[in-house]
């Protein structure tokens, strides 16, 4: 059923208030190191998230020490279809001004990997959770690492 814009705003405020009460999420171990190596390689960093939380996006740009610019983030508000549809990644390619063969996608979720593969981009799986490796590889990931730190340490190799 459709709800009014006023009611949707009310629900969004409640959701945001609850989100802000949660303990601060820690960055993934090695993410700053990986992003610094990516930047040093001359590549652009773009974040594609299924979130539409403004507070989360502001936190992301702040916590990543300026490694991600706000105009280089694709959120749920930028697309009609989220992952596993490739639209979020295609929008990211457009924002970055690159072709699929000029990009890589780093993903930790099966639906995100499926979206990356559908966008025809080399897709790297990082298993950051309890899923078996096969759950990520079976979606078409080109390579798999077991942590962001492992990926960062192997970046130049």
Annotate the PLM regions.
Residues 1-19, 29, 37:
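A metal-dependent, Asp-based hydrolase signature
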Residues 2, 42-43, 97:
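Residue-level recognition of short, well-ordered coil/turn positions
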Residues 5, 9, 25, 50, ...:
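Non-catalytic, surface-exposed connector residues within folded enzymatic/regulatory domains
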Residues 11-16, 44-52, 90, 110-111:
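Short, mixed-charge, low-aromatic patches
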Residues 20-47:
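Short, acidic loop-to-helix structural element flanking the phosphoryl-transfer center
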Residues 32, 36, 52-157:
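Asp-based, Mg2+/Mn2+-dependent phosphohydrolase catalytic module
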């Amino acid at each position: 059923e459709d709800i009014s814009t006023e009611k949707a705003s009310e629900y969004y405020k409640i959701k945001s208030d609850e989100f802000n009460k949660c303990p601060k999420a820690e960055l993934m171990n090695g993410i700053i190191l990986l992003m610094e190596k990516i930047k040093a390689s001359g590549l652009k960093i773009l974040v594609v998230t299924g979130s539409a939380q403004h507070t989360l996006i502001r936190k992301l740009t702040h916590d990543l020490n300026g490694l991600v610019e706000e105009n280089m983030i694709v959120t749920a508000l930028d697309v009609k279809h989220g992952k596993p549809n490739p639209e979020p990644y295609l929008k990211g390619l457009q924002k970055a001004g690159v072709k699929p063969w000029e990009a890589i996608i780093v993903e930790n979720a099966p639906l995100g990997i499926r979206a990356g593969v559908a966008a025809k981009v080399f897709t790297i799986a990082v298993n950051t959770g309890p899923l078996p490796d096969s759950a990520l590889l079976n979606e078409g990931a080109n390579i798999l690492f077991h942590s962001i730190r492992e990926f960062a340490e192997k970046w130049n190799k």
